[in-house]
Amino acid sequence: MAKKGKKYVEAAKLIERTKAYDVAEAVSLTKKANTAKFDATVEVAFRLGVDPRKNDQQIRGAVVLPNGTGKTQRVLVFAKGEKAKEAEAAGADYVGDSDYITKIQQGWFEFDVIVATPDMMGEVGKIGRVLGPKGLMPNPKTGTVTFEVEKAINEIKAGKVEYRVDKAGNIHAPIGKVSFEDEKLVENFATIYDTILKAKPAAAKGVYVKNVSVTSTMGPGVKVDPSSFSAK
């Protein structure tokens, strides 16, 4: 196990490891315990009572956070004709078809999100083995395979985040930056929490949300008491 730095150890002293905090207090502590010299990302982590090995317990989707993420997303759009023009007008950073397929095959990844029209997925599929492991493959469940190109781009630029349960039953999602006001982080937190609740698979048994915590990029995690925001 890697040894924690002195700043991390000092920051961790601010937090009672066994205590589950009110969400507002958890957000405040997360900001105070941040040790990064840059504007670190604040992230929420859910441990869920699902079995991701079963197809009927997969959880994946996307949600637009009311206060954004604090990160400017670079959007690559695979489209042709009028849809390509629509993407350019909507503010996509890159728009093209086979030319960008070739660039990606050559190791170009100067983008954060891909949007593709359904008719382009045959081409995009050629680089699926490259995009998949990086979490960049467009998917209808996250609204990134669509003919509604302008809407998709606007949502991404406004602060849309994707979430997906991992093999261990966890979901991690950004909710902003440490520079955000506490209230804005709490609002973003409540939005993603409500979204995860609504995404509960019918086949999931027992306790669904087992644990929730908030952390910054280089800071210690802070446990959150679900009852402090479940009614919000």
Curated annotation (Swiss-Prot):
Q: Which GO terms describe its biological process?
A: regulation of translation; translation
Q: Which UniProt keywords apply?
A: Repressor, Ribonucleoprotein, Ribosomal protein, RNA-binding, rRNA-binding, Translation regulation, tRNA-binding
Q: Gene Ontology terms, cellular component aspect?
A: large ribosomal subunit
| Gene3D superfamilies to which the protein is assigned, alphabetical | 3.30.190.20, 3.40.50.790
Q: Could you tell me one molecular function GO term of this UniProt entry?
A: rRNA binding
Question: Could you tell me which InterPro entries the record lists for this protein?
Answer: Ribosom_uL1_bac-type (IPR005878), Ribosomal_uL1 (IPR002143), Ribosomal_uL1-like (IPR023674), Ribosomal_uL1/biogenesis (IPR028364), Ribosomal_uL1_3-a/b-sand (IPR016095), Ribosomal_uL1_CS (IPR023673)
Output the PROSITE patterns linked to this UniProt entry.
RIBOSOMAL_L1 (PS01199)
Question: What is its biological role?
Answer: Binds directly to 23S rRNA. The L1 stalk is quite mobile in the ribosome, and is involved in E site tRNA release.
User: Partners and quaternary state?
Assistant: Part of the 50S ribosomal subunit.
Q: Which family does it belong to?
A: Belongs to the universal ribosomal protein uL1 family.
Q: What is this protein called?
A: Large ribosomal subunit protein uL1
